[in-house]
A protein has these predicted regions:
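Metal-dependent nuclease catalytic regions and adjoining charged, substrate-binding loops involved
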Residues: 12-13, 17-24, 31, 35-233
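Active-site ExK catalytic segment of metal-dependent nucleases
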Residues: 1-14
Length: 234
């Protein structure tokens, strides 16, 4: 059973086909039928404006569920996010995302949370009950540790919207104009190397050289990863 406003309900009646009306709903109902071992099902759509009903019997299409499972597997294991089907000005982006969420979604800023799931060393486990694994320390990671992250964190390069100059097991070097920025763990920092927390703050100002100088002063005086909230404060 689905509900729809009058406009969408009229579109369904004109299409005369539930699966032609919505490709998302079509995939959904096919997966439901396959999972429940049904060969056909009755779908009912309720008009929220005038209580009208649309009914249709839908037959199963073999292979849809397996195809969607394979697609889900590819997405889960991907090292880069799928290409967005929406432009940065699409109403779904503007209406349903905060300014911060839009900036992260459009790769203009790094996410606020530095954690295992956005670290290059981690990967999902899809066997058994699932989970996450750290390849740096060669062990599974429970949820609490995933959320906390660690000082060996290196951003997934797909989240850093800069050209890659070079990368190693424990660092990635990016270019911003003539300047290089190496994302490295806390114990491997140099004058052009930055922790993931520092990279996050620098991304808010598009890696402004003046803010980089300020960061270096803070680091020299107070230590790594201290007073970062002051870097971009206006």
């Amino acid at each position: 059973v689905k509900s729809a406003n009058n406009s969408r309900f009229n579109e369904l009646q004109q299409a005369e086909s539930y699966e032609q009306w919505s490709s998302n709903y079509a995939i959904q109902i096919q997966c439901y039928m396959a999972a429940l071992n049904l060969s056909r099902t009755l779908v009912v759509v309720y008009n929220k404006n005038d209580s009208g009903l649309y009914t249709e019997i839908i037959d199963i299409r073999e292979g849809v569920l397996d195809k969607m499972k394979q697609k889900a597997r590819q997405i889960i294991l991907a090292r880069t996010p799928p290409k967005s089907p929406y432009s940065s000005t699409d109403y779904r982006i503007k209406k349903f995302m905060s300014a911060k969420e839009q900036a992260v979604y459009n790769l203009e800023q790094l996410p606020d949370n530095v954690n295992c799931r956005n670290c290059k060393h981690s990967e999902p486990i899809i066997e058994g009950d699932g989970g996450w694994r750290c390849n740096k320390f060669n062990k599974p990671i429970d949820e609490a540790k995933q959320r906390a992250g660690c000082e060996q964190h290196i951003w997934l390069s797909s989240l850093v919207n800069l050209p890659i100059e070079s990368q190693g097991d424990d660092s990635i070097t990016y270019m911003k104009g003539p300047n290089s920025f190496t994302n490295a763990p806390k114990d491997q920092l140099g004058r052009t190397s930055y922790t993931s927390h520092e990279m996050k703050e620098l991304s808010k100002v598009n890696y402004d050289p003046e803010v980089v100088k300020k960061l270096m002063r803070f680091r020299d005086e107070f230590g790594v990863n201290t007073r970062l909230e002051e870097l971009t404060r206006k």
